[in-house]
Amino acid sequence: MSYHVYVSNAGSDYFSKFLLDTASGALTQEDNVDLGGQPGAVATNADGSLMYICLRSAKTYQSYRVNKVTGQLNLINKVDVPQGGPYLNTDNTDRFLMATYYGAGAVSVHKINGDGSIGEKPLQWIETEVHAHSIQFDRSNQYAYVPHTNPPNSIYQFKFDEITGELSANDPHKVQPETPEGPRHFVFHPSKDLLYSVNENGSTVSAHHFDANTGQLISFQVISTLPDDFDGENNTTAEIRMTQDGRFLYASNRGHDSLAIFDVDEDGSLTSIGHQATEATPRYFDFDPTGTYLLSIGQTSGRMATYLVNREDGSLEPMATYEVGDSPLWIQFVPKE
Protein backbone atom coordinates (compact mmCIF):
# COMPACT_ATOMS: atom_id res chain seq x y z
CA MET A 1 0.00 0.00 0.00
CA SER A 2 1.08 3.58 -0.60
CA TYR A 3 0.36 6.89 1.12
CA HIS A 4 0.49 10.47 -0.03
CA VAL A 5 2.71 12.39 2.40
CA TYR A 6 2.30 16.15 2.74
CA VAL A 7 4.85 18.27 4.64
CA SER A 8 3.58 21.68 5.73
CA ASN A 9 6.35 24.29 5.40
CA ALA A 10 5.69 27.39 7.50
CA GLY A 11 8.46 29.32 5.75
CA SER A 12 7.30 28.47 2.22
CA ASP A 13 4.06 28.83 0.28
CA TYR A 14 3.66 25.14 -0.39
CA PHE A 15 3.47 21.59 0.85
CA SER A 16 6.35 19.29 0.01
CA LYS A 17 4.74 16.17 -1.45
CA PHE A 18 5.94 12.56 -1.37
CA LEU A 19 4.60 9.09 -2.06
CA LEU A 20 5.41 6.49 0.60
CA ASP A 21 5.83 2.84 -0.37
CA THR A 22 5.02 0.96 2.84
CA ALA A 23 6.68 -2.23 1.55
CA SER A 24 10.11 -0.59 1.42
CA GLY A 25 9.75 2.65 3.37
CA ALA A 26 11.03 4.60 0.37
CA LEU A 27 9.66 8.08 -0.31
CA THR A 28 9.34 9.35 -3.87
CA GLN A 29 9.37 13.14 -4.07
CA GLU A 30 6.61 14.62 -6.23
CA ASP A 31 5.68 18.16 -7.28
CA ASN A 32 5.15 20.67 -4.48
CA VAL A 33 1.55 21.64 -3.71
CA ASP A 34 1.23 25.42 -4.12
CA LEU A 35 -1.05 26.95 -1.49
CA GLY A 36 -0.63 30.68 -2.08
CA GLY A 37 0.34 31.31 1.53
CA GLN A 38 2.46 29.95 4.34
CA PRO A 39 0.81 26.81 5.75
CA GLY A 40 0.74 25.63 9.34
CA ALA A 41 -1.49 23.05 11.00
CA VAL A 42 -3.31 20.41 8.97
CA ALA A 43 -6.21 18.04 9.68
CA THR A 44 -8.14 15.49 7.62
CA ASN A 45 -11.34 13.57 8.02
CA ALA A 46 -11.11 9.87 8.86
CA ASP A 47 -10.72 8.55 5.30
CA GLY A 48 -8.47 11.38 4.10
CA SER A 49 -10.87 12.64 1.43
CA LEU A 50 -11.10 16.10 3.01
CA MET A 51 -8.21 18.24 4.23
CA TYR A 52 -8.25 21.38 6.35
CA ILE A 53 -5.25 23.71 6.34
CA CYS A 54 -4.37 26.77 8.36
CA LEU A 55 -2.65 29.42 6.23
CA ARG A 56 -1.04 31.38 9.04
CA SER A 57 0.22 34.26 6.90
CA ALA A 58 -3.20 34.76 5.27
CA LYS A 59 -5.15 34.17 8.51
CA THR A 60 -7.49 31.70 6.85
CA TYR A 61 -8.63 28.12 7.26
CA GLN A 62 -9.04 26.35 3.94
CA SER A 63 -10.97 23.22 3.06
CA TYR A 64 -9.85 20.94 0.23
CA ARG A 65 -11.16 17.80 -1.42
CA VAL A 66 -8.32 15.32 -1.85
CA ASN A 67 -7.94 13.32 -5.03
CA LYS A 68 -6.68 10.15 -3.38
CA VAL A 69 -5.39 8.76 -6.69
CA THR A 70 -3.13 11.69 -7.59
CA GLY A 71 -2.90 13.48 -4.24
CA GLN A 72 -4.11 16.72 -5.82
CA LEU A 73 -5.92 19.18 -3.54
CA ASN A 74 -9.04 20.94 -4.83
CA LEU A 75 -10.18 24.01 -2.90
CA ILE A 76 -13.72 23.89 -1.49
CA ASN A 77 -13.76 27.12 0.54
CA LYS A 78 -11.80 29.31 2.91
CA VAL A 79 -12.79 31.31 5.97
CA ASP A 80 -11.08 34.26 7.62
CA VAL A 81 -9.93 33.95 11.23
CA PRO A 82 -8.42 36.50 13.67
CA GLN A 83 -5.05 34.75 13.63
CA GLY A 84 -3.59 31.49 12.43
CA GLY A 85 -3.80 28.85 15.12
CA PRO A 86 -1.02 26.36 15.87
CA TYR A 87 -3.34 23.34 15.85
CA LEU A 88 -6.34 22.05 13.90
CA ASN A 89 -8.34 18.91 14.62
CA THR A 90 -11.71 17.39 13.81
CA ASP A 91 -13.89 15.71 16.39
CA ASN A 92 -14.41 11.96 16.06
CA THR A 93 -17.54 12.42 13.89
CA ASP A 94 -15.72 14.71 11.41
CA ARG A 95 -18.59 17.20 11.72
CA PHE A 96 -16.69 19.93 13.57
CA LEU A 97 -13.31 21.61 13.11
CA MET A 98 -11.50 22.74 16.25
CA ALA A 99 -8.63 25.22 16.46
CA THR A 100 -6.46 26.65 19.21
CA TYR A 101 -5.01 30.17 19.31
CA TYR A 102 -1.61 30.54 20.96
CA GLY A 103 -1.46 34.33 21.16
CA ALA A 104 -5.15 35.03 21.70
CA GLY A 105 -5.55 32.26 24.25
CA ALA A 106 -8.71 30.73 22.83
CA VAL A 107 -10.41 27.74 21.22
CA SER A 108 -12.82 27.89 18.27
CA VAL A 109 -15.38 25.44 16.90
CA HIS A 110 -16.44 25.59 13.24
CA LYS A 111 -19.12 23.44 11.66
CA ILE A 112 -18.04 21.23 8.76
CA ASN A 113 -20.86 21.23 6.21
CA GLY A 114 -22.03 18.23 4.22
CA ASP A 115 -19.98 19.26 1.19
CA GLY A 116 -16.82 19.48 3.30
CA SER A 117 -16.79 23.26 3.47
CA ILE A 118 -15.98 25.05 6.72
CA GLY A 119 -18.72 27.16 8.28
CA GLU A 120 -17.96 30.84 7.75
CA LYS A 121 -18.46 31.87 11.37
CA PRO A 122 -17.38 29.84 14.41
CA LEU A 123 -20.11 28.17 16.42
CA GLN A 124 -18.05 28.96 19.51
CA TRP A 125 -15.12 31.14 20.49
CA ILE A 126 -13.96 30.23 23.97
CA GLU A 127 -11.35 32.31 25.75
CA THR A 128 -9.00 30.25 27.88
CA GLU A 129 -5.53 31.67 28.52
CA VAL A 130 -2.51 32.59 26.46
CA HIS A 131 -0.43 29.77 24.92
CA ALA A 132 -3.31 27.41 24.03
CA HIS A 133 -1.41 24.87 21.95
CA SER A 134 -3.51 21.90 20.84
CA ILE A 135 -6.88 20.17 21.18
CA GLN A 136 -7.83 16.49 21.03
CA PHE A 137 -10.77 14.26 21.99
CA ASP A 138 -11.00 11.05 23.96
CA ARG A 139 -12.20 7.85 22.27
CA SER A 140 -15.81 8.42 23.33
CA ASN A 141 -15.87 11.93 21.79
CA GLN A 142 -17.36 13.21 25.06
CA TYR A 143 -14.30 15.06 26.35
CA ALA A 144 -11.71 17.43 24.89
CA TYR A 145 -8.44 18.76 26.30
CA VAL A 146 -6.45 21.90 25.53
CA PRO A 147 -2.87 22.06 26.86
CA HIS A 148 -1.32 25.47 27.57
CA THR A 149 2.43 25.92 27.91
CA ASN A 150 3.90 27.97 30.77
CA PRO A 151 2.35 30.31 31.68
CA PRO A 152 -0.39 29.30 32.54
CA ASN A 153 1.00 25.75 32.72
CA SER A 154 -2.33 23.95 32.51
CA ILE A 155 -4.55 21.53 30.61
CA TYR A 156 -8.11 22.81 30.15
CA GLN A 157 -10.76 20.10 30.41
CA PHE A 158 -13.98 20.29 28.40
CA LYS A 159 -17.13 18.28 27.91
CA PHE A 160 -18.17 17.95 24.28
CA ASP A 161 -21.63 17.59 22.71
CA GLU A 162 -21.05 15.83 19.40
CA ILE A 163 -24.58 16.72 18.20
CA THR A 164 -24.28 20.50 18.57
CA GLY A 165 -20.49 20.82 18.60
CA GLU A 166 -20.61 22.69 21.91
CA LEU A 167 -17.67 22.65 24.30
CA SER A 168 -18.45 23.30 27.96
CA ALA A 169 -16.20 23.51 30.99
CA ASN A 170 -15.65 20.29 32.89
CA ASP A 171 -15.22 20.42 36.67
CA PRO A 172 -12.50 21.25 37.47
CA HIS A 173 -11.97 23.29 34.33
CA LYS A 174 -8.20 22.79 34.31
CA VAL A 175 -5.43 20.73 35.83
CA GLN A 176 -1.96 22.10 36.50
CA PRO A 177 1.39 20.39 37.04
CA GLU A 178 2.95 21.11 40.42
CA THR A 179 6.04 22.47 38.64
CA PRO A 180 6.17 24.72 35.52
CA GLU A 181 6.31 21.92 32.95
CA GLY A 182 4.24 23.62 30.25
CA PRO A 183 2.01 20.94 28.61
CA ARG A 184 1.99 21.30 24.82
CA HIS A 185 0.68 18.19 23.00
CA PHE A 186 -0.60 14.81 24.18
CA VAL A 187 -1.57 11.28 23.22
CA PHE A 188 -4.03 8.77 24.62
CA HIS A 189 -2.98 5.18 25.21
CA PRO A 190 -4.60 3.06 22.45
CA SER A 191 -6.37 0.67 24.83
CA LYS A 192 -6.03 1.94 28.42
CA ASP A 193 -7.43 4.99 30.21
CA LEU A 194 -4.15 6.88 30.15
CA LEU A 195 -3.06 10.22 28.69
CA TYR A 196 0.52 11.40 28.19
CA SER A 197 1.46 15.06 27.68
CA VAL A 198 4.76 16.34 26.36
CA ASN A 199 5.78 19.41 28.33
CA GLU A 200 7.56 22.13 26.36
CA ASN A 201 9.09 24.15 29.19
CA GLY A 202 10.15 21.34 31.50
CA SER A 203 11.46 18.96 28.81
CA THR A 204 9.35 16.23 30.38
CA VAL A 205 6.47 13.86 29.74
CA SER A 206 3.60 13.61 32.23
CA ALA A 207 1.54 10.43 32.58
CA HIS A 208 -2.10 10.84 33.63
CA HIS A 209 -4.87 8.50 34.63
CA PHE A 210 -7.99 9.34 32.60
CA ASP A 211 -11.40 8.79 34.20
CA ALA A 212 -13.64 7.78 31.30
CA ASN A 213 -16.77 8.46 33.38
CA THR A 214 -15.93 12.04 34.38
CA GLY A 215 -13.25 13.08 31.92
CA GLN A 216 -10.89 14.03 34.73
CA LEU A 217 -7.10 13.73 34.48
CA ILE A 218 -4.87 12.82 37.42
CA SER A 219 -1.10 12.97 36.93
CA PHE A 220 0.93 10.10 38.40
CA GLN A 221 4.40 10.51 36.82
CA VAL A 222 6.66 13.20 35.36
CA ILE A 223 9.81 11.99 33.57
CA SER A 224 12.57 13.87 31.74
CA THR A 225 13.01 13.57 27.97
CA LEU A 226 16.74 14.39 28.24
CA PRO A 227 19.90 12.51 29.18
CA ASP A 228 21.16 13.33 32.67
CA ASP A 229 24.21 15.18 31.33
CA PHE A 230 22.31 17.60 29.05
CA ASP A 231 21.34 21.08 30.29
CA GLY A 232 17.57 21.41 30.12
CA GLU A 233 17.86 25.20 29.77
CA ASN A 234 18.98 24.57 26.20
CA ASN A 235 15.98 22.47 25.21
CA THR A 236 12.24 22.53 24.65
CA THR A 237 10.04 19.61 23.66
CA ALA A 238 7.54 19.61 20.81
CA GLU A 239 5.73 16.42 19.76
CA ILE A 240 4.66 13.10 21.28
CA ARG A 241 3.54 9.78 19.79
CA MET A 242 2.87 6.21 20.96
CA THR A 243 3.11 2.95 19.05
CA GLN A 244 -0.14 1.30 18.01
CA ASP A 245 0.32 -1.50 20.56
CA GLY A 246 0.95 0.98 23.40
CA ARG A 247 4.37 -0.49 24.26
CA PHE A 248 6.59 2.49 23.41
CA LEU A 249 6.29 6.27 23.59
CA TYR A 250 8.38 8.92 21.82
CA ALA A 251 8.90 12.67 22.40
CA SER A 252 10.96 15.18 20.43
CA ASN A 253 13.68 17.39 21.93
CA ARG A 254 14.45 20.73 20.29
CA GLY A 255 17.98 21.60 21.40
CA HIS A 256 19.20 18.10 22.12
CA ASP A 257 17.74 17.36 18.66
CA SER A 258 16.63 13.86 19.46
CA LEU A 259 13.66 11.58 19.84
CA ALA A 260 13.37 10.36 23.42
CA ILE A 261 12.19 6.75 23.62
CA PHE A 262 10.27 5.30 26.57
CA ASP A 263 9.08 1.84 27.51
CA VAL A 264 5.45 1.80 28.70
CA ASP A 265 4.85 -0.53 31.64
CA GLU A 266 1.62 -2.47 32.21
CA ASP A 267 0.57 0.13 34.80
CA GLY A 268 1.24 2.96 32.34
CA SER A 269 4.44 4.23 33.94
CA LEU A 270 7.33 5.21 31.68
CA THR A 271 10.99 4.18 31.68
CA SER A 272 13.55 5.97 29.51
CA ILE A 273 15.29 3.50 27.18
CA GLY A 274 17.30 5.83 24.96
CA HIS A 275 17.50 8.65 22.45
CA GLN A 276 17.68 8.71 18.66
CA ALA A 277 19.49 11.66 17.06
CA THR A 278 17.34 13.38 14.45
CA GLU A 279 17.05 16.54 12.34
CA ALA A 280 17.72 19.94 13.94
CA THR A 281 14.75 21.35 15.86
CA PRO A 282 12.37 18.40 15.44
CA ARG A 283 9.07 20.23 15.78
CA TYR A 284 6.98 17.38 14.41
CA PHE A 285 7.21 13.65 13.83
CA ASP A 286 4.71 10.89 13.24
CA PHE A 287 4.35 7.21 12.42
CA ASP A 288 3.05 6.21 9.03
CA PRO A 289 -0.45 4.70 9.32
CA THR A 290 0.95 1.14 9.39
CA GLY A 291 3.20 1.97 12.35
CA THR A 292 6.23 0.59 10.50
CA TYR A 293 8.06 3.85 9.88
CA LEU A 294 8.61 7.10 11.73
CA LEU A 295 9.07 10.40 9.88
CA SER A 296 10.71 13.37 11.64
CA ILE A 297 11.10 16.90 10.27
CA GLY A 298 13.70 19.46 11.33
CA GLN A 299 12.33 23.00 11.52
CA THR A 300 15.79 24.55 11.14
CA SER A 301 17.36 21.89 8.90
CA GLY A 302 14.62 21.88 6.26
CA ARG A 303 14.90 18.10 6.01
CA MET A 304 12.82 15.05 6.85
CA ALA A 305 14.38 11.86 8.21
CA THR A 306 12.81 8.41 8.05
CA TYR A 307 13.31 5.53 10.48
CA LEU A 308 12.34 1.88 10.65
CA VAL A 309 10.57 1.15 13.94
CA ASN A 310 11.75 -1.94 15.82
CA ARG A 311 8.49 -3.28 17.25
CA GLU A 312 10.33 -5.48 19.77
CA ASP A 313 12.52 -2.93 21.57
CA GLY A 314 11.24 0.45 20.31
CA SER A 315 14.54 1.47 18.73
CA LEU A 316 14.64 3.48 15.50
CA GLU A 317 16.87 2.51 12.57
CA PRO A 318 17.80 5.51 10.36
CA MET A 319 16.83 4.98 6.72
CA ALA A 320 17.05 8.17 4.63
CA THR A 321 16.74 11.96 4.65
CA TYR A 322 14.84 14.19 2.22
CA GLU A 323 14.88 17.92 1.48
CA VAL A 324 11.62 19.73 2.19
CA GLY A 325 10.71 23.44 2.40
CA ASP A 326 11.58 26.14 4.93
CA SER A 327 10.51 25.69 8.57
CA PRO A 328 8.56 22.44 8.20
CA LEU A 329 6.14 21.88 11.08
CA TRP A 330 3.55 19.24 10.14
CA ILE A 331 3.26 15.89 8.33
CA GLN A 332 -0.03 14.54 7.00
CA PHE A 333 -0.71 11.09 5.52
CA VAL A 334 -3.52 10.25 3.08
CA PRO A 335 -4.05 6.71 1.70
CA LYS A 336 -3.50 6.42 -2.05
CA GLU A 337 -6.19 4.78 -4.13
Where are the regions that the model predicts?
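Short loop/turn segments immediately following the C-termini of beta-strands
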Residues: 10, 56, 102-104, 112, ...
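Structural signal for beta-propeller blades
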Residues: 14-15, 59-61, 105-107, 152-155, ...
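Beta-rich, blade/repeat-based domains predominating
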Residues: 36-47, 79-96, 127-141, 177-192, ...
